[in-house]
Structures are given as structure tokens and as C-alpha cells.
């Protein structure tokens, strides 16, 4: 029975990916750049939009000629530089600490050693950097190094939860995006990680929004057990038992 259940779940995931590809286009694989740049950009992207984090990253690159310069910059100056990305007083020291640790551990800023390292070792290596969590680790490994991992941001977590792919609890504790990384990696085929990740992000931004999801327009409507919670009119009509029907 477990094998049959797993097969059904795998088929459902493939159907979700196919429908999202049809609705939003098939995501094209485009490596974002070197791994250290991806690490810094992902830290900047925390709790803000892509537009804001992109502006902050562009300002950082314009002001500083090297990662050494970023690591050595006066903290108030770096905070001012990345201000458009939000939470700059938190992100600036986190970026500097990460860069200094990479330099100390590698002698430079080249993280290509992670490309051929066993995957779990690469995860542990990156996750051992102070302030680098599972999402940042996954983004660096997937987008910069092409490793088969599943980044889970708020959009991916929300959509996957509503689709019933992620349970509300993990043991005695609430499920979180951090815990969902490994769960989703176990049910999504590795060749589908990239399409699944980007498809759920697009879907979460355009249709399955945090507030007022547009369920009637959703290409996954018939696959989603949560739709009727937000749009009661979508709940299937319940047939009354024969004993409750009026007699003629």
C-alpha cells in the first residue's frame, strides 16, 4: 500500500508541475552566477522583494570592487549601501561575517569546491556559516552550482501546504519552511526541483496569494483541498441522505 500511495503522490506532483508549466511557461535553467554572489544576494533577498534585493545588490557591486572590500567596509557604510533591501542593520553584519568565514576556510571566495562535494557534505559546509539557513544553502547549491536541492521560500511553503503536499505539523511541532525542504525533496523528482520551485513561486505571487487567493482562476483547483476554505462556493454540494428527502 505504501508503494501505491507514493506512486499516486509522485503522479500528482508531476501533474502539478505540468499544469504550472502550461500556465506560466516552462522555467529555463539559467545559473545566477558564482556561488558567493548567490550567497550574498540570497541574504539580501530575505523578507523583501526581488526588486528591492536586486537594487541593494547592484548598489553593493557598484560601491565595492571586491568581496575583500565588502568584508572590510565600515559597518554603517555597508548598511547605508544595502538599505534598499530592507533590514540592512541585520543583513550587513551577516554578509560580512559570512564573507570573512569563507575567506578563513578557503583562503578566498571561490565556492566551486562545493560543486563536486557529496551533497550532504556541501549542505553542512554552507550551513555551518553563521547566519546561513536552509533556504540560503539550497539557493546557492541549486542556482549557482546546479545541485539537486529544493529551496523553500514563503511562496513555495504556502502553495505546497495548501495543496496538501506539506502537513501542518512535523511530529509535535508546527511545520516550517525550514523543515519542509527535506520533505519536498523526498516527493518531488530531482529533475523537477527547478521547475517545481519556480512554478510554485510564480503561482504564489500571481494566483495562490497569501491573502485572497484567486481559487476560481487556479489551474490546480481540482487538486487543491484548501480551495473551499477560501471560496466556500467551490465546496461540492452534499447530497442529503434518502431519509431526509421530502416524500411526494
Q: Where do the protein language model's features map onto the residues?
A:
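Catalytic cores of DNA base-excision repair glycosylases
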Residues: 3-241
Amino acid at each position: 500500500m505504501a508503494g501505491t500511495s507514493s506512486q499516486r503522490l509522485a503522479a500528482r506532483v508531476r501533474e502539478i508541475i505540468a499544469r504550472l508549466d502550461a500556465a506560466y511557461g516552462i522555467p529555463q535553467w539559467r545559473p545566477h552566477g558564482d556561488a558567493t554572489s548567490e550567497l550574498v544576494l540570497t541574504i539580501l533577498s530575505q523578507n523583501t522583494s526581488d526588486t528591492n534585493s536586486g537594487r541593494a545588490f547592484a548598489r553593493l557591486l557598484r560601491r565595492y570592487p571586491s568581496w575583500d572590500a565588502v568584508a572590510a567596509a565600515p559597518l554603517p557604510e555597508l548598511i547605508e549601501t544595502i538599505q534598499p533591501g530592507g533590514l540592512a542593520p541585520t543583513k550587513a553584519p551577516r554578509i560580512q561575517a559570512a564573507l570573512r568565514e569563507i575567506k578563513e576556510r578557503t583562503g578566498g571566495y571561490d565556492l566551486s569546491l562545493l560543486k563536486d562535494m557529496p551533497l550532504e557534505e556541501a549542505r553542512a559546509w554552507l550551513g555551518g556559516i553563521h547566519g546561513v539557513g536552509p533556504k540560503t544553502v539550497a539557493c546557492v547549491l541549486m542556482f549557482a552550482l546546479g545541485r539537486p536541492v529544493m529551496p523553500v521560500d514563503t511562496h513555495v511553503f504556502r502553495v505546497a501546504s495548501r495543496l496538501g503536499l506539506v502537513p501542518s505539523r512535523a511530529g509535535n511541532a508546527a511545520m516550517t519552511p525550514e523543515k519542509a525542504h527535506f520533505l519536498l525533496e523526498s516527493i518531488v523528482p530531482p529533475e523537477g526541483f527547478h521547475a517545481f520551485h519556480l512554478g510554485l513561486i510564480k503561482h504564489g505571487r500571481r494566483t495562490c496569494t497569501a491573502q485572497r487567493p484567486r481559487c476560481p482562476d487556479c489551474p490546480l483547483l481540482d487538486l487543491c483541498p484548501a480551495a473551499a476554505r477560501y471560496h466556500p462556493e467551490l465546496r461540492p454540494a452534499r447530497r442529503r441522505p434518502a431519509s431526509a428527502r421530502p416524500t411526494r
